[in-house]
Amino acid sequence: MLLAGCGSKADPGFSPANPVNITIWTYYNGEQLEAFNALVDEFNSTVGKEQGITVESSSHGSVTDLENNVLASAEGKVGAEAMPNIFSAYADTAYALDEMGQIADLSDYLSEEDRAAFIEDYLSEGDFSGSGSIKIFPVAKSAELLFLNETDWELFAAATGATYDDLATIEGLVSVAERYYEWTDAQTPDIPNDGRAFFGRDAMANYMLIGAKQLGCTIFDAQDGSMTLNFDHDAVRTLWDNYYVPFIKGYFSASGRFRSDDVKTGNIIAYVGSSSSATFFPTQVIADDMDSHDITRKALESPKFANGEDYAVQQGAGMVVTKASDAEIQASLVFLKWFTSPEHNITFSVDSGYLPVTHEGNSIDAIRISGLALSDEMDEVLSAAVDTVNENHLYTPRAFSGGTNARAILEYSMSDKASADRAAVKEAMAQGQSFEEASAQFLSDECFEAWYQDTLASLEAFQG
């Protein structure tokens, strides 16, 4: 990949005799920060030294801390640091800074050959206007996968005949979860309705947005920062029937901060979450002081709706280049293109379950021959993630005003209600009601309609 002479800009305006400094702010921590800093050092001692570019990188803590610091700089607040040349950002933050006139459009700096190297859906995330602009440079992405406590799954599968193929669709997943609840309930015949949940989800907004896309509906249709809402009644009812309903019945659950926490406590044995969460999957189930056992992990592609369209979520922050001198923008691109070349991008990405962003790098063969130490378990995770990227349309909503708050409604409206209503069902059963009596009001059409209208009204506030 050519590193000098970005796109149509022939004279970069920097050299060893006329050097340029580039500042980068990230939210990276731990191993990811160490990997990034090591690559920055490598760049500075090689390509940077040859071309007169010095990159200075600093971590600003969490994603929220970084967002706050960037906004303070953009607004010129007292005590704020000068704007960096590059910062890590998700689309909504990048859009807010773009509205303030702070973001460089990189489309003029990238040739057709440059663009063709990247997975197209990753580049389009930063095209806020739909005009072909590039205001977010992709650096590392993750995919959603289905993670299983393989040890306890094998006991269940041996007893019931359940297979991994049963988990390929969302409808199949719900059916398996029902069988798991009934199988565990039957183990204590003297105690009715004490079956255990099978499944949970880490990111409900992803389920709502991607599930709707699979069903032919784009909930947030954004253009030029304005959103048109398509909260299709039938599609949303399907989403409800395949999350809220099994949750009320005890087949799904969510109690810890993350679903990997629920696997650790034995609350569930499967969840859909980011490929980058693989490193947090527990190696033991510790249900209580008297019940603990070692487990292994299985990673599969995330289930999709039967007969639905092939959509999967694309997620992971990119790098945003701020407006500056032409030399600084071009130098920023030299670093970012070097960083996303397969050799370096694979080094940065794979240890933490992230994926390279180019067609060449996003190949399990390229990852395997990279020379990096890759455990069998991480190989399985990355194989499933690479297949997800290569076999689906990748989707994330375009940024729009209030997008973060609108997404939060999708994240919590159904899941919070499911948790509260399941708790009410359990309390009613503890008071002597049958499950049918305790759950009747929650499994009614009227319950869905009331929630649907409330959620629709909340989302309509973000239209236009």
Task: Cite the ranges covered by each PLM segment.
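Short, polar/charged alpha-helical segment
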Residues: 30-54, 95
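Extracytoplasmic/periplasmic substrate-recognition and gating elements
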Residues: 75, 249, 287-361
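Hinge/lid segment of periplasmic solute-binding proteins
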Residues: 88-145, 189-191, 292-303
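Extracytoplasmic/periplasmic solute-binding protein
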Residues: 129-144, 171-228
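Glycine-centered hinge/linker elements that transmit conformational signals in sensory
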Residues: 174-181, 222-256, 298, 302
